[in-house]
Amino acid sequence: MRGDRGGGRVSVVYSQHPDALPELAERLSGLTVHDPGGPAQCLVRTGQLLVPRARVEDAARILRRWVDTVETDGPGLLRLRPPVAADCVRIAADVAERVPVAANHVHLVGTPVLHGTGAVPTPADPPPPPPREVWAPPVTVTLFDTGLDPHPWFADRPWFDPTTAELLDEDADGRADRQAGHGTFVAGVLLRHAPGVTIRAHRVLTPRGLTDDRTLAAALHHESTRPHPHVIVLTAGCHTADDRCPPVLADELARFPTTAVVAAAGNTGTTRPFWPAALPGVVAVGASALDGSPAPFTNRGPWVDRHAPGVDVLSSHVRLAGGVRTFGAARWSGTSFAAPRVAAEIARARLTPPPPPAPRARAHPGP
């Protein structure tokens, strides 16, 4: 999919690139594509196996012939010996009935070279800023994304934490990376439709739009030690070889029994489960096009619970030019931007008494 300027909107054209994951694995070290081009294709960290915290000793014992080192500062990480590192998915499958172990899957958002979502955010005229509502008692939404920059929409709100600022140029080439500003954009969608929420931001995604099971699981575990939020928003995810959720993610999400977990359904245009969105109890959100039909890139299947606008979405954004950050607005497409729309709806329902409907910005129409 690509984004083109045209009348202030993004023209969305969907296309899949079957060689995209192998190409990514060639460009970035430490990645392996399992079953490239096949029905079990998934992207993993080479030679890494993960196991829930309570089963680390069992996994290390069962897998001792293949394991080089074991790390326990977070979800259990078993590093395989180099000769078998590329076989991590197969090795995990061989013992999966005995211990809940799986490869460390790489999670993705957005990049069109990979999976056909809005190529890059397109600069747009900003809509009116969200109202400065104060909800009492507070309704908290925790966002796991690229971080949150001090955009004028939320920089002076009492909940804003400057330590969560986005890293915009990870490769230090002087240009913002392809998914830079993703978290700031998602937070803007949330505030446009639930302007009184309190946002907690966790920076788990790189500005290239990548994270993995272990990084997300560690962040979820940290969040579970705090007063639990009303809503969690997850904007990235992964496919797995066996189409089952990575055990460490299921284990950590089970720590939030009273929290509504909302997750992007993914942009791979498939019916394969996308994790953690496809977990029972998680609200999986697909993207709808401007006419209300499912967007061509959105994942489909009985595990997708809701659809929300995910094409030409208008929200807050941060850009990088000459090393200087500038704040404004952009249009972008993807299920990542449908998920916060549903999260906002849930957050508004958690407020007692419920607030009046959010006003529509007539001068700047758009999702």
Regions found by a protein language model. Give the residues of each.
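Active-site core segment of subtilase-fold serine proteases
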Residues: P121-T198, A218, H222, R226-P227, ...
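Glycine-centered tight turns that cap/initiate beta-strands
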Residues: P100, W153, H228, T258, ...
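Inhibitory N-terminal propeptides of secreted protease zymogens
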Residues: R2-V109
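Extracellular S/T/G-rich loop segment that most often corresponds to the catalytic His/Ser-adjacent loop
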Residues: G147, F274-L351
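Short helix-loop-beta-strand segments that form the rim/entrance of peptidase-like active sites
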Residues: L190-T211, T215, P354-A361
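Structural detector of well-ordered beta-strand residues that form the stable sheet scaffold
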Residues: A102, R200, A260-V262, A284, ...
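Protease zymogen maturation seam
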Residues: E71-P82, A86-T140, T146-L148, P152-A155
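Substrate-binding/access-modulating region of protease and related hydrolase catalytic domains
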Residues: R2, L205-L279, P294, T326-A339, ...
